[in-house]
């Protein structure tokens, strides 16, 4: 039976190199032979197919595709014959002369054996052995065939199809590490043809990121070198694959494994912003990915100059190039952040009242110094900038401390002047109430507690009865102009005074209203009594007239 199979098989193989009609007939007959094979004859067919040494270039891909059909038809029964099939595939790749059709046929055969040669009920050790039998010859071909580029490219393509298979998860960590090691050496040694190698790197970084992290820097350097080769050779497809490989590594691997290469990737991607459209879009996406990873590792990274920023950020800005305001002060010497939100109310309390400008306040006293520091202090309230001269970067905290002391002294002097002007126009009782108000005055807002508000109201009621000179309203009802230097806490007292006057008018009208209400109630009660009496009278005297007459029998 094996002899008859061998003769028919060789005859059909010979017909593959003939005219197209004979070729189609031969392939149909060969596939029929594969499907009709008995399980006991599979090893004979595999041995005869593997022993074919002289296969034409055109028929090589079709011959290897029979292994794919054999795996689909017989499943796990092909697993014991993988050690015989793989040398035939390696030999076919060596003689393919770079034919993409033959390489794709070999990759499909490897993927089919990995998929159908392992059953879900297969023990884990047997699954690992099957993957090892498929992977080991291909991994060795990446290194041993550096002088044979066709074999290396075909092996890389077959390995990619194997890695993308679902059963690749059964591969041991040692096997994955050997593949990564061979791939790193092959990428370093290859000069021009490396597209299949870069595709294999992307597949491994997707399925085995933890193992690839040990070789991440080598892959990045190889990718950048291949990117430069793509520029020299004018190969846009090679540039695109190299950029995609770098992007895959940054997306799937731990950023710490390639942290030292991120800035280099960013700088290289900037060179391809004017390349062809699809290359430019891939470079832009990769550059944004690199920038995001760099910013996560170094928040002070400057994307414009691609270096860490040396200037202070926040309300203290460099005069050479003012950065965007980020709400914090950063000191380079002690590398500590100082939040400037706490300094707003103290440093710019005079600005909040609207009566003091920053340039005219005693806060700016640095003009007499001769040294120039190179930073300005920006007002967060009105946007003015205060030039600070003669202050070193390391003494920025002391500057804030002196500014806070000066602002507190300035506030005390302003409050004392307003209190003195108020005391000259008020009597003793008004001065006491003004002191209570000034005690709770801050930034021009009155903050009187409820009890003090009641005391002020009672005092104003007494003032309205005893002295008319203390009221700011004239008898004609018009208001007198007040001095502009009076404190803002007088405004609530004027409202209280007007309320007190309204209350006195209401108290004068209360007796009249009470008497009128009493008379109205008395009239209504008398009227109701009269109506009730009239109704009872009419009911008593008209009842007899309303009764019908009684009939008396005669």
Curated annotation (Swiss-Prot):
It is found in: Nucleus membrane. A motif (Required for nuclear localization) lies at residues 551-554. Keywords: Immunity, Innate immunity, Membrane, Nucleus, Transmembrane, Transmembrane helix. The chain crosses the membrane at residues 522-542. Residues 306-332, 411-442, 465-487 are annotated as: Disordered. Its main location: nucleus. The KASH domain, which contains a transmembrane domain, mediates the nuclear envelope targeting and is involved in the binding to the SUN proteins. The keyword Membrane applies. Residues 509-554 form the KASH domain. Disruption phenotype: No visible phenotype. More susceptible to the oomycete pathogen H.arabidopsidis (Hpa) infection. One of its GO terms (cellular component) is nuclear envelope. The keyword Cytoplasm does not apply. Residues 311-321, 465-485 have a biased composition (Low complexity). Residues 17-290 are annotated as: ARMADILLO-type fold. It is a single-pass membrane protein. Plays a role in innate immunity against the oomycete pathogen A.arabidopsidis (Hpa). Residues 419-431 have a biased composition (Basic residues). This is Protein SINE2. One of its GO terms (biological process) is antifungal innate immune response. Residues 322-332 have a biased composition (Basic and acidic residues). PANTHER family: MICROTUBULE-ASSOCIATED PROTEIN TORTIFOLIA1, TOG DOMAIN-CONTAINING PROTEIN. It comes from the Eukaryota. It comes from Arabidopsis thaliana (Mouse-ear cress).
